[in-house]
A protein has these predicted regions:
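Short beta-strand segments
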Residues: 7, 65-69, 107, 131-137, ...
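Short, charged low-complexity linear segments at domain edges
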Residues: 142-158
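A short acidic/small-residue loop/turn micro-motif
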Residues: 31-34, 87-88, 155-158
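A charged helix-plus-loop insertion that forms the helical arch/lid used to bind
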Residues: 77-88
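ATP-binding/phosphotransfer module of carbohydrate and carboxylate kinases, centering on a glycine-rich
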Residues: 1-63, 73-76, 94-102, 116-126, ...
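Glycine/small-residue-rich loop that forms an oxyanion/phosphate-binding "nest" at active or ligand-binding sites
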Residues: 105, 111
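Short glycine/serine/threonine-rich phosphate/pyrophosphate-binding segments
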Residues: 13, 112-115, 137-139
């Protein structure tokens, strides 16, 4: 039996046919429309196209799994609110079921990515894992015993909104001091720009050709590798914030594995070694406690499709 995985993003909707081993047989991409009725119709058309091109009969499809950004109630099959898409109470399960006649399940996009990496990716072979996705904010997913744990009404698993600083920086969620204000890719860029303005002789200026608007998540890291003192300080401080965010979750769940994804994860072992060392030194239980394995996500842009399909694992 095959499964359909649908990864809804702010810019595009990726749909794929996935086999029982988590391999994508074929996939397609369409632009995300802000009209939810159009989105559903486009997904239905993409599924029909994939079935036709692969010679797959609809009777061979176990179900459609959907990953979507925002607040998702998996039990009700509803995207309650997606701020990036300005969607409210999007009944995706009911809508897709009506169009296709197939069973449909939905979960938050970060949750399905975590599920994909646990079942088929970086943490394959581990039952319990937590994934942190470092981007505009900090997405996260928790997998316990091979299944997504999303809390009551599917509203939990938000590591980006644990508090690092009481009365700290104002977060877009309305609270202050949230982790994503310090450990997201957006925060890293902000910290990098601040350090550059305070250190006019920093190699970080060379990396961006003197244009501070070209700063991205690589600027401080690549300059740090060349020994630039200001960049080293930015990276070490950022890794401290990220490590403390991870520790907050480790000390509650103590998973078998931690997965780091998103743009910043492209730094690979350079990032991972710093975070691993910090967490092993400062976690509850110190050297006597069992260590959670740490990995960089490996499925990339396919994690959303694979994880969504795995809702029918």
């Amino acid at each position: 039996m095959y499964r359909i995985g649908v990864d809804i993003g702010g810019m595009s909707v990726k749909t794929g046919i996935v086999d029982e081993n988590g391999a994508i047989i074929k996939k397609t991409v369409t632009k995300t429309d802000r009209n939810t009725d159009v989105v559903l119709e486009n997904i239905k058309n993409d599924i029909d196209k994939l079935l036709s091109e692969t010679g797959t009969d609809i009777s061979e499809i176990k179900g459609i799994g959907v990953g979507c950004p925002g607040s998702v109630d998996s039990e009700k099959g509803e995207v309650i609110y997606s701020n990036n898409l300005d969607w409210w109470h999007f009944l995706v399960v009911k809508g897709l079921n009506a169009l296709t006649g197939l069973k449909v399940r939905v979960s938050n996009d970060a949750n399905v990515a975590a599920l994909a990496e646990t079942l088929y990716g970086a943490a394959k072979g581990y039952k319990d894992a937590i994934m942190f996705t470092l981007g505009t904010g900090i997405g996260g997913g928790i997998v316990i015993d091979g299944k997504i744990y999303a809390g009551g009404h599917s509203q939990g698993a938000e590591p980006g909104h644990v508090t690092l600083f009481v009365n700290g920086e104002k977060c877009s969620c309305g609270r202050r001091g949230c982790a994503e204000m310090y450990a997201s890719a957006t925060a890293l860029i902000k910290q990098t720009k601040k350090a550059m303005l305070e250190n006019k002789d920093s190699k970080m200026w060379d990396f961006v050709g003197g244009d501070i608007e070209k700063v991205d998540g690589r600027t401080a890291f690549e300059s740090s590798k060349k020994g630039d003192p200001a960049a080293v300080k930015v990276v070490d401080t950022y890794c401290m914030y990220l490590s403390e965010t991870i520790l907050n979750m480790l000390n509650i769940f103590r998973p078998d594995a931690v997965i780091i994804g998103g743009g910043v994860s492209a730094q690979g072992d350079y990032l991972l070694d710093k975070v691993r060392a910090y967490c092993e030194k400062d976690h509850y239980g110190y050297i006597l406690a069992p260590k959670s394995k740490m990995f960089i996500a490996k499925l990339g842009n396919d994690a959303g499709i694979i994880g969504a399909a795995a809702l029918f694992e």
